[in-house]
Amino acid sequence: MIYTVTIDASGAREAAQRGQLVVVVDVIDMSTTAEAAYQGGALAVYGASPDETASPVPRDPGWMAGYAAKEAKERSAELIVAAEPRTGSEAVQRQVAGKVFAALAKEGIEPTVVGNLGAEVTRLVDFKGKVVLIVSATGGVAFEAAALAHPQGPRGVLTATIARAGKLRGSQAARAGIQRAISQAGERGICIAAASGQSLEDVLAAQYLYELLLERVRR
């Protein structure tokens, strides 16, 4: 198996094209929101891009929203959208993620909408038994780019963080993310992808998670 670390949505996309399980790291806040959702009992967590982004990778937020909506229907679950701006009004969040909400409306889904707040998001909504879609200009873009390119689609992409989430403290959140990746990767290998090479916290977190991954698989 191949274990690698990369940066940016383009790097995540390249890893997906190789068939590696891609682990997106966007500490502030997408992957931390995702970990909080997992710890809160979410059934599945996905990422999508907003309508406007400077990233050069192929995007299709409507497709990602449709995928999440179909899973919610299949599992008879509610859908939660965590959107940006993180502290903006729902009206602004719906405008920024217009393609996502249009696709959900087409599927007949009316989601619960919260901000992409990181660990604090669990104070606003109960994630247990829900499907979650996080719309984010960094982690969401990287997740979507990888999902569109991966042979297994969104099933080939996960998230991880080094920040505390739920009841996890210290290195527990990081270890939870790595264990989830190892359990799902099989023989495909894993790529840890810092969502933005311009965000030092993502780059350092990705390197930490990569070293944690190597430590875990070499036991």
Residue positions per predicted region:
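N- or domain-start disorder-to-order transition segments that initiate the globular core
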Residues: M1-V5
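Short acidic low-complexity segments
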Residues: I7-A16, N116-L124
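Short acidic, Gly/Ser-rich segments with clustered Asp/Glu that frequently serve as metal-coordination loops
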Residues: S10-A15, Q20-A36
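Short, ordered loop/turn segments at secondary-structure junctions
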Residues: P50, R86, N116-G118, A195-Q198
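Ordered, amphipathic secondary-structure segments that act as subunit-interaction surfaces
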Residues: M64-L117
